Structures are given as C-alpha cells and as structure tokens.
Amino acid sequence: MLFRSNKTNPSYEGIDLKAKPSDTKDSKYNTEYASNEITDSIVGVLCYSDEITDDSQCTSQGSGIIITSDGYVVTNSHVIGNSKTLYLIQIVTSDGKQYKAGVVGYDTRTDLALLKMDDASGLKAANFGNSKDVALGENVIAIGNPGGIKYSNSITQGIVSAVDRQSSITTNVKFIQTDAAINPGNSGGALVNMFGQVIGVSSSKIAATDYEGMGFAIPSATVKDVIDDIMKYGYVQGRVMIGVVGENVQSRGNIPAGIAIYSIDEDGPCGNTELKQNDIITGADGKKISNFAEFYDVLESHKAGDKLELEYYRTSDSSTGKVTITLQESK
C-alpha cells in the first residue's frame, strides 16, 4: 500500500492572514526574531517509492510549513509527485521527530499540496501574514531544507525584489520575487517577513547563472485560497479541467508551440473526441495557446458545464483541427 488515507476537515476556519504589528519600527523585528518565530513550524518532507526503513532511499524531498497544531502541513505539489498515491511520505520536524503522513489534496495549477501527519499534536503552527501588504525592498528570510534534510532549517536573507511576477510557463500564479537564496530542497518552505509571518511558500528558482539571485514564492493570499478549499473539500472548488496530461512544447520547424497531449482521460471532457495522443493544443476560446500558463488564464473565466473550443495540431500528418468540449469540475 503506497499511501495512507487522510480526511478533510470541513470545520477548518481557514488560514488567518495577520496584519503587520502596530510597532513595526521596533528594533526587535529582525532576522533573529523572524528565525526564532518560524523555525519550529518548518518540516522536512521525504517521499519514498517503497516502505520506509532505515535503509530506504527517498525519491523526492522538500520542505513544508505546519499550519495546525495537529499536523496539517503545506508543501509544493511537485514534491509529492502531483499525486495522492505515488509515494509514502515521512515528515521530519525541527526536533528530529519522524511522522508518517498522507496527502489530503493537491493543486497542480498553483503547485500547492496539503499533507496530514499521523498521530501529531502540540505542534507549533506558523503565523501567516498578508502578501497583499508586502512592500518592495522589505527584508525577508527564506527557510527550508536546501539540498535535503541534512541541511534542515537553513536560513537565507534577502529582500522582496518584486511582486505579481509571472515566472513560469506552467502556472498562472503571480509570484513574490526575492533575492534570498532558494535552492533545491527549499520547495515548500517559507518566505518570512521580519515579524515572523509567512508571506509566501517557496516554489521555484530560475536555475541559470545569468539569473542568480532570483527566487520565487507563492503569495500567502493564494496559499490561503487554495489550502482552505483543500482542507475542507480535498480539492479546489470551481476549478475546471479538460482531462488530459501534457507538457509545454516550443515551436520547431513547422510544428507550433502549445501543449503536447501525452494521455487522455476517456471519462473526461476530451474523451471520445477527435483529440489523440501527441496532438498539440494550440488554441482555446479563439486565443492562441503556447503554454499551460496561457491555458489556465482561459480556464479561469469558465465554470463546469461550459463549452470550450480547442484548436489542435496533429503531429502525425501536420493537419489542424478544432473540437468543442464540455468542461468538468476538477476534483
């Protein structure tokens, strides 16, 4: 059995986005204060393909943020393989204690996931600030496990370099940009202001030497919207899907950019249509689509039951076509 079942919590009141304290100019609010406030709320997330033993090698690892005293943890969806069942999951807290955990739900569109630790109590939940109050140039720290659990609770310092930054062609999330170092293993960790409040969940880093010093975090306001729904329902309400698995592809020769289809859910909106594996989605609603970020922007304006016209390119014979589907709720 490769997963543990975890229930939602319909009575959850939601992540509380706190305002900055009134005495913001007090000198006590510095990196040391912020570090002390957040350290015990950061965990390591270790994912295993097989049973967890002392000799097991983890397949994926990242960081997470405790949001309730009984062990609900926010992390990135890609850390857990964008799946409820792919991995056995172990959580390691700041004091070295180990817990088994399961996936409550995940959202690939924002790269967020919610985990539940087994038999956990008395944990320190992180305080969250409101990312809408973030100021350019504001001092921040990033905390997580860069390079894995052996470097747990590593802290780097920086500033808020930009807000509402589109940094990825796989999501339409508008990120907080920082120059605080965010390295592999930091995924799912916290970006924290000097008041010890989480203002973002670390998600990605442009891994190129020309762009050193550009880290990105999912804003806490987005985290609240997504995680509150997952906690209550196990998924994000109101999201629609087309029922395909695919990947962004760039144009090459006569082949256009778009979303290459790897598989189609026969029970989904694209099942029993003319679309085939290896077709490339190039348009939706009359708009050109070259990546998932653009496609998600189109889907945001639709609800389950809406009709959506897709344009596609067939790689097998270089033909093009259109198909109309009925959108379903993504659960």
Regions picked out by a protein language model, each given a short descriptive name:
Residues 2, 43-45, 64, 71-75, ...:
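Terminal peptide-recognition signature
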Residues 3-63, 228:
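N-terminal activation segment of mature serine protease catalytic domains
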Residues 19-21, 68-150, 290-292, 309-311, ...:
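Conserved active-site neighborhood of the chymotrypsin/trypsin-like protease fold
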Residues 25-33, 49-72, 97-100, 125-127, ...:
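A conserved glycine-rich beta-strand in the N-terminal activation segment of trypsin-fold
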Residues 30-34, 146, 198-253, 300, ...:
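C-terminal cap/linker of serine protease catalytic domains
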Residues 51, 181, 229-298, 306, ...:
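PDZ/PDZ-like groove recognition
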Residues 51-53, 57-59, 79-88, 123, ...:
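Active-site loop architecture of trypsin-fold serine endopeptidases
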Residues 67-68, 128, 134, 192, ...:
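Short, well-ordered loop/turn sites that connect or cap secondary structure elements
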